[in-house]
Design a protein with these regions (language model features):
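Histidine (H) residue identity feature
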Residues: 34, 82, 93-95, 133, ...
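Catalytic-core regions of hydrolytic enzymes
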Residues: 104-119, 123-186
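A generic local secondary-structure boundary/capping motif
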Residues: 78-81, 159, 188-189
Length: 200
């Protein structure tokens, strides 16, 4: 009987330790909220406020008040349907051969296509959307890398897919940004290195 009590106590302590460790890990991984901003219509109508608080404009692109119209944006209904049988989101890669500084040779999961797989699983499993993920290599023709024509090949292919799947409401051409070898587009969230995201 004493041995049984000892075993039960050990099991209980180890379970409590596991729950404590799990809670600590979850708290450490949680993203802390940013300070609250005044998001009144007047503030959102201010182009400089939007630019300074929500956007980073790359030096190779431009932005203007005409294409950052908050009032028009907020008036739109961006909600998606959650039908269980038809796709709502399409993900593809004009440049499927894009890799990262630490990608392993020949490992698809380390490429932008692998990022697409991960995004697909998040949108499907966590948010309940039906997602199509196209993995065609539009930037490889006859064994040669050709990124310039990839957009044309991808456009033709995606247009056909959209004709066959009119339920698709969002199309994402997912890329890894092309930058100089010594440039790393990362930021820090709660002390963890995190990739920056550009919506374009």
């Amino acid at each position: 009987e004493e041995e049984l009590k000892t075993n039960l106590k050990t099991d209980t302590n180890s379970k409590a330790l596991t729950e404590t460790e799990t809670t600590a890990a979850a708290q450490q991984a949680a993203v802390l909220p940013h300070p609250l901003l005044d998001l009144s219509p007047d503030r959102l109508a201010d182009y400089d406020f939007l630019l300074n608080n929500f956007y980073i404009v790359d030096e190779n692109t431009d932005a203007s008040a005409a294409n950052l119209n908050a009032a028009q944006f907020l008036a739109e209904d961006f909600s998606l349907s959650h039908g269980p049988l038809e796709p709502q989101i399409l993900i593809y890669h004009s440049h499927s051969q894009e890799t990262f500084a630490d990608s392993r040779e020949g490992e698809e999961s380390d490429t932008i296509v692998g990022v697409g797989d991960y995004l697909t699983s998040l949108l499907t499993e966590k948010y309940g959307y039906q997602v199509m993920h196209i993995k065609e290599a539009f930037d490889m023709m006859s064994g040669e890398l050709d990124r310039n024509k990839a957009y044309d090949y991808a456009c033709d292919y995606v247009e056909k897919v959209l004709e066959e799947n009119p339920s698709v409401e969002v199309v994402i051409d997912l890329h890894r940004d092309g930058v100089d070898e010594d440039r790393r587009l990362v930021t820090e969230i709660n002390g963890k290195t995190t990739a920056q995201i550009l919506f374009y």
